[in-house]
């Protein structure tokens, strides 16, 4: 089974959500992930949704789709990849933590 990517699009930040979704799926496929998407009705923060989905990575169309505090929370549980510009953020490593 392939690792899981949690696709996230902030619809307030996106000017073309369908295009962004296609780009997230394309990057996930290229990196070898299967994509799961959030429940549209969920009010949970992105980090909690990604944790519930057991995601290995959260893929965003661009860095501005997550604020800095939420990015920090997401990086506690998953890597973060962005489509454009192409960035990779590794999850925080906790010294002595067993995962």
Task: Give the location of each predicted region.
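Short, structured surface patches at the beginning of a domain
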Residues: 1-99
């Amino acid at each position: 089974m392939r690792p899981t990517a949690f696709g996230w699009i902030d619809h307030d930040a996106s000017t073309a959500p369908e295009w962004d979704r296609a780009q997230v799926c394309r990057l996930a496929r290229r990196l070898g992930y299967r994509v799961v998407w959030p429940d549209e009705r969920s009010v949970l923060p992105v980090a909690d949704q990604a944790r519930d989905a057991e995601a290995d990575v959260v893929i965003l169309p661009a860095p501005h789709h997550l604020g800095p505090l939420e990015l920090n929370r997401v990086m506690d549980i998953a890597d973060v990849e962005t489509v454009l510009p192409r960035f990779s953020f590794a999850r925080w490593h906790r010294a002595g933590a067993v995962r």
